[in-house]
């Protein structure tokens, strides 16, 4: 395809931290370009998932194609790919950026630059994108445009002299943003081959259409009736329809080079069009696939079990469909003595885990129990083999373990100066070691290496509370480090409950064991017999507590009378309780499994 026909195409996405007004700016751009009538407009048009709306965050990448009549009299085709801002979804961002030539960096004029925008902006610069800074929320009384510009230059290191000040809420200067997109972001470059290459940015399952793929056509064109080949699997599929989102789904005769749109090809197998794959024509395939994306490795694992065992096949199907839409989700079947059959699932972080569980419960009407999340440990066995362990119950016997290594992450925290003390104290409590502190204008960047197990549970919430919500966090995995780790098991009446096991640092084992026993005592209902709750490391019991039995007052019918008669009745009751304890089983409520999560939140 000639560079002439691509000259008026602009592919861009928006990079911003959570809550800096990215979705609102997208709404204004859609409105200005006439994508939707005023009566059809609603807040957060592209956040179509109800969970996205409620939490006010973007989870999935969405795309929209808009015609824009610029001041120079030419009509440009703007393809906008929405990106999430939360650290757990950074892989979604890199996928969206791979399909663009430019990005808008949106910074809140009142809050300044935050850590997640920095990380995503570096990704954009590495991929060679043109970054256009936009300073949003200038209608706020606390807005300080000059400070925001200075921070963009100091923290990110890109020139902010031509940053566009806007208010997405009132629509002020949004036209200037569109002009900046047209004049500063380059058009797509033609490739050296004319054979079809299209990158799959995203896929989702539609009950009527099968798999719908969002693609960026790099070279060639796709039209209905073409036979496409998925390059990684070698399978062929016939195209039913192609088109774009405006944001409504609109069918087009063909998608040409440089364009972003959707393709349906009646693919019923949910693994038929993997994200990051390349589509080409079966009759005339491209010599090699496009460079895809990095595979994201899940960092947090948890068991998901259906409350009703009959829902197991439905849970498998729901996870399959969700996996298509969420490339970072991993799962494999797992069985637990306490919970029955379910799946061990891998997530990118706690927010990712919460959202997957919420989507399964809402979109697929499943009732689920989740076990406490754990991170992946590396275990060096005495015979020299190394295994990756994502479930504490699978730790080999102590005499077979040479050492246990935990994952370490590098965390970058951006915070206003006055909260440095609180944040350093929090990081030290979490066994962190400081790498460095940089003063950047009024902001401070603190770098720490922290054990991932400490970060996964509640570090993000605590960071927000010690900094009154001003600090922001970005982290990435660095390496595995050996340490003195032990597995704490929970025994209830002498039976080990595998779903409650956890791996902890030896120095914390006694405290965690005591806390867990006390928590269990509050949550396990009283039975007709004593229930012993113990925490053990190997064969050594480190904590114990007892849920006392409920007793009937067997002396109620004795008015006065001989003491030996009373003793006889009490002894008889005692014998009965003893027999009951041998055969009785304790039902453990769901709250008890979640207790492991809330132990640090006291």
From Swiss-Prot:
Family the UniProt entry places it in: Belongs to the TRAFAC class translation factor GTPase superfamily. Classic translation factor GTPase family. LepA subfamily.
Positions contributing to GTP binding: 19-24, 136-139
Primary localization class, coarse: membrane
Family annotation (PROSITE patterns): G_TR_1 (PS00301), G_TR_2 (PS51722)
Signal peptide segment: none
Enzyme class: hydrolase
EC number: 3.6.5.n1
Stored CDD domains: EF4_II, EF4_III, LepA, lepA_C
Domain of life according to the entry: Bacteria
Transmembrane portions of the chain: none
Catalyzed chemical reaction(s): GTP + H2O = GDP + phosphate + H(+)
GO-annotated molecular function: GTP binding; GTPase activity; guanosine tetraphosphate binding; ribosome binding; translation elongation factor activity
Ranges where the tr-type G domain occurs: 7-189
GO cellular component: plasma membrane
Gene symbol of the encoding locus: lepA
Name of the protein in its database record: Elongation factor 4
């Amino acid at each position: 395809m000639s560079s002439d026909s691509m000259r008026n195409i602009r592919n861009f996405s928006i990079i911003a931290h959570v809550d800096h007004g990215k979705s609102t700016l997208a709404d204004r751009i859609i409105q200005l370009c006439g994508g939707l009538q005023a009566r059809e407009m609603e807040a957060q048009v592209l956040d179509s998932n109800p969970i996205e709306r409620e939490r006010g965050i973007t989870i999935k990448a969405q795309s929209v194609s808009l015609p824009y009549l610029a001041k120079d009299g030419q009509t440009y085709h703007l393809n906008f790919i929405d990106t999430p801002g939360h650290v757990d979804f950074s892989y979604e961002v890199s996928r969206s950026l791979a399909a663009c030539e430019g990005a808008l960096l949106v910074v809140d004029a009142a809050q300044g630059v935050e850590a997640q925008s920095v990380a995503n902006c570096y990704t954009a610069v590495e991929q060679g994108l043109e970054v256009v800074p936009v300073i949003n929320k200038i209608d706020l009384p606390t807005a300080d445009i000059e400070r925001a510009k200075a921070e963009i230059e100091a923290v990110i290191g890109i020139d902010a002299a031509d940053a566009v000040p806007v208010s997405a809420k009132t629509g002020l200067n949004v036209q200037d943003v569109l002009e900046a997109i047209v004049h500063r972001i380059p058009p797509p470059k033609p490739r050296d081959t004319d054979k079809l290459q299209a990158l799959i940015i995203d896929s989702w399952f539609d009950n009527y259409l099968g798999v719908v793929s969002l693609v960026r056509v790099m070279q060639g064109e796709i039209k209905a009736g073409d036979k496409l080949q998925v390059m990684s699997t070698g399978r062929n599929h016939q195209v039913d329809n192609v088109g774009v989102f405006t944001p409504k789904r609109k069918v087009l005769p063909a998608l040409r080079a440089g364009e972003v749109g959707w393709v349906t090809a009646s693919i019923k197998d949910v693994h038929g069009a993997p994200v990051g794959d390349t589509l080409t024509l079966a009759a005339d395939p491209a010599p090699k696939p496009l460079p895809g994306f990095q595979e994201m490795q899940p960092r947090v694992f948890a068991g998901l079990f259906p409350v009703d065992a009959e829902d197991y096949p439905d849970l498998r199907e729901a996870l399959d469909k969700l996996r298509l839409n969420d490339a970072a989700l991993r799962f494999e079947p797992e069985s637990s003595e306490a919970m029955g059959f379910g799946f061990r699932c891998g997530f990118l972080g706690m927010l990712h885990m919460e959202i997957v569980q919420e989507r399964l419960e809402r979109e697929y009407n499943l009732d689920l129990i989740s076990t406490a999340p754990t991170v992946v440990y590396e275990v060096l066995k005495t015979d020299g083999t190394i295994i990756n362990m994502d479930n504490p119950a699978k730790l080999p016997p102590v005499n077979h373990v040479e050492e246990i290594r935990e994952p370490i992450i590098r965390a970058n925290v951006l915070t206003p100066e006055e909260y440095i003390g609180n944040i350093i104290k929090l990081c030290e409590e979490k066994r962190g070691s400081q790498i460095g502190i940089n003063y950047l204008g009024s902001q401070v960047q603190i770098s720490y290496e922290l054990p991932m197990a400490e970060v996964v549970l509640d570090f993000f919430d605590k960071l927000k509370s010690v900094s009154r919500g001003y600090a922001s966090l970005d982290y990435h995995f660095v390496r595995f480090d050996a340490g003195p780790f032990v597995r704490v098991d929970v025994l209830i009446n002498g039976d080990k409950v595998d779903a409650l096991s956890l791996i902890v640092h030896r120095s914390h084992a006694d405290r965690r064991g005591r806390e867990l026993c006390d928590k269990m005592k509050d949550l396990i209902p009283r039975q007709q017999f004593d229930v012993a709750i113990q925490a053990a490391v190997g064969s050594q019991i480190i904590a114990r507590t007892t849920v006392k039995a409920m007793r009937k007052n067997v002396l109620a019918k004795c008015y006065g009378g001989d003491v030996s008669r009373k003793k006889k009745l009490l002894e008889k009751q005692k014998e009965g309780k003893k027999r009951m304890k041998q055969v009785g089983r304790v039902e453990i409520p769901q709250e008890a499994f979640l207790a492991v999560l809330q132990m640090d939140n006291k």
